[in-house]
Amino acid sequence: MKQLYKKSNLFGLLFCLMFGSAFAQTRITGRVSDAVSGDAIIGASVLEKGTSNGIITDIDGNFALSVSDPNAILVVNYTGYGSLEVPLAGRSQVDITIAEAEGLLEEIVVVGYGVQRKSDLTGAVGTVKAKDIERIPTASVEQALQGKIAGVYVSPSSGEPGRGATIRIRGTGTLNNAGPLYVVDGMLLDDASFVNPQDVASIEVLKDASATAIYGNRGANGVIIITTKRGTKDRKAVVSLGSYYGTQQIAKKLSLVNGSEFAQMYNELPNNSSPLANPAQYGEGTDWQDVIFRDAPIANAQLSVNGVWKKLDYNVSGNFFNQQGIIEETGFERYTGRFNGEYPLLKNLKIGTNVAYSKELLQSVGGGVLGGVYRMPPIYSVFDSTGKYSDPTKFGQSIGNPAADLFYKNDQDTRVNRLVGTVHADWTFLKDFTFRTNYGFDRRNDHFRYHEPVFMVTTSQLNNLDRTTRDTTKTQNWLWENTLNYNKAWEDVRLNVLAGQSAQENYYKKRNTINGILQPNGEQITEWAMLSYLGRVNATFFDRYLFTASLRADGSSRFSKANRWGYFPSLAAGWNIAEEPFMRSQKVFNRLKLRASWGITGNDKIQEYPSLGTISNELYSAFGDTVQQGSTLVNYANADVRWETTRQTDVGLEFTVLKGRFTVEMDWYRRFTFDILSDLPIPDYVGSGAFPFVNAAQVENTGWDFTLQWRETKGKVSYNLGMILSPVKNKVLKLNEGKSEIFEGRTGSGDFSTRTAVGSPIGAFYGYQVEGVFQNQEEIDSAPNFGIEKPGDFRFADLNGDSILNSMDRTYLGSPIPTLTYGFSAGMELFGFDIAADFFGVKGNKVVNAKAVARFDTPNWESVWNENHWTGEGSSNSVPRVTNGGHNYKMSSFLVEDGAFFRLRTVVLGYTLPQRWLSNIGMSRARFYASGTNLWTKQSYSGFTPEFPGDNSFRAGIDYLSYPMAKTMLVGLDVTF
């Protein structure tokens, strides 16, 4: 690993010593605002005319830009407004107002290692700006992306506070971790949980290979670039305060039987030796959801100060976020602090830093609470007549009182302390060259603690040993990158050339103890390192013809020397058709661009050391009763293991019509991923359950991204409408030799519920097809069955027609991967009021209601069972009889439900006080608002929510009784001084 960095250190040193002279530049600061309302224009592009040197305005409309000439001309553009040229005439401070325009304006987009004009962009990049993030309160940056960008599927991992989200960009392209790369202020990371959404200036999602190949072996699953807010560039400090408070409720409760309905159904159980007398006496009984779920508060407070102090541009912020869970004794608390600053040491040399600290506390409860809610009979109250917790073991040893679990298993928490940041220096010389050195770091400490006291509720709900389990993890990650950028503009040509080097190292250590004693295999240490070289060329000719080429070489310590290096090229071209002379007379298109790209990227989210054999230490009783320490092989070595690789092709069309009001972007893409790492089965006679990793599998994703947007301003009224559509098809093209299928995702019956095979999607559901319910013995005798069926049991299809019912009759039952994701948004601002609403939905996916397997071995049922279950011949052909055995519990189409949904994700109503009311009290802005989240959902699924994708692609879409989603109502206030 040390040898890997000898080249890195030498390369960086050569960069630093390469040039010894520089030319001065002039630093310009200013603010861009609306010519009518005076409101700040957020995200406007400010360019030095004749160059690609530019920047975008921040949340307050402010900008700072170093120009080559004190008499340069600034070109200011923003969608929906007119383009404006501003001669500097020696000024270093300019306030600019722009008005609504007839034509289309320029936009600046953040890309890998730089920025580009939207009109020059050849890649597929989606953007969410600060204004869109701030108007809708969210707990994480992942939530802010849901339904916002075509091709980006965001689904919460759980409804539990503090849990992250699963993000898939243009489908699932691997059998391993398919999560994207995050780049936060230049630091390359696997997650962005530490980022406070209110600190974000913009989020860019890089989707095609032209945009992601510059990140090489980490770009295959897409890249999310997060840029946080900088100083306002004003001389005086700007202080912003924001706070909101609200309440949360469970978004949807299960419809379960009441006490009397339960007693009646229980009495129908076959071989029931102790029926319940007089079912009506139990009445409504106890809805255990009301016992465990609660209304829970949510609160947030934000303070930020930004400005300039003695040439230091700064943005300082602090945030407190607290979200209590809708299940008792659960919740999440986070403190964050951030400092972003930049200081010009010389006219051509500036240094800066972006540092964030976060402290998190996640409180959870032990297993059994949600299961008890689902399985506990409603005829019981929380306590029995003696004041003890009720004992439900009469109805099954596996049933526990959820209130008791909540009381005895609530001492569980995870604490996270994290420091993430970058330190950089930018040196401009020879007018057109900029050298940047950037050092990034990520220091993270996690401490999980779970204390379970001695208790006994029943003979099956107890704990005999007072114990405290602790998991402590320490992660240290550093990154050092050096880039040289050449920007040159001629009359009809703009050229940008980037060359760079990157080095990164990660150290991870985990330790597991119980009551202070280190457990077998309780300590784990992993390290990896990466050395990379990168380059890119962007060229624009006559504002019409666009070309991009990039190449990155990555060397990784994860692989053997023979396969350590991977090379990831990309090519792209674009044609701004609307800029052609033959288009100048037409009045339809303000913008019309065709683009195409091709490239290769890799996936580094794989198991550590796949090329090496690994062992695990275990305790064995191999010699009588004496326990001995031993070791077992986990996987065999394979020195030929190499990168997972994705080859992607993209064709896109963008156009804007109706004087810049209506914009359409559409892309067709094909992602072909090959050399996917998978385990290779070995013969049983080898005598080990271990396996080697091999590059064998292939997966294809094809689809479309559509984005439609309408923006219009008339006087003091502005409104916008937006829609995204993202159809995608996922298919496995190849698996390992000798391994034609992969089974995963066991249900409570022990059956596997998913099968990954050639020709089907990853993690497709697989099982028996239910044809109906046997109505009488004659039907059973005349049909293939398992041999113990009774009237009222499922009739499974004999799909291969051999008159024998067995595992060969299982079939494809649907996919957890949506074939279509879509979103709608609408917003309006008028006379100080603003209203916005976002909708999000998916179609074409299925979910497995795995928790329903419990209905075949322990009592308690949903209301639909009471209403529709089989009670005699002709009574039902869809829901079986009440039973506690047989084969009805097998993985079948009965457990598979429609996973489609359409949700009102957020709605916000706000009012901004007029400026004239605030000037006398020192305020520059004050806005009150009310917001609702997850207020309405249209779904067919009978469970809490159809969203439970999980990080494991083989087990996505299986409901093992996940934490329910909450709906939220809150009020808030934002003020600026």
Regions found by a protein language model. Give the residues of each.
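A short beta-strand motif that forms part of the nucleic acid-binding face
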Residues: G80, G219, R230, Y245, ...
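Extracellular/lumenal ectodomain signal focusing on beta-strand-rich modules
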Residues: G43, D95, E107, T127, ...
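Short, small/polar-rich motifs associated with maturation and membrane association
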Residues: M1-R338, Y343-S358, S390-D391, V420, ...
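Extracellular/periplasmic, surface-exposed regions of secreted and cell-surface proteins
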Residues: I133, G179, D185, A296-A299, ...
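Generic short beta-strand segments
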Residues: K207-D208, G318-F321, M808, P914, ...
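Surface-exposed, extracytoplasmic segments of Gram-negative outer-membrane nutrient-acquisition systems
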Residues: P279-Q281, S621-V634, F672-A696, K729-I817, ...
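A surface-exposed, glycine/aromatic-enriched loop/edge motif typical of exported proteins
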Residues: Q249, L254, G259-N272, I351, ...
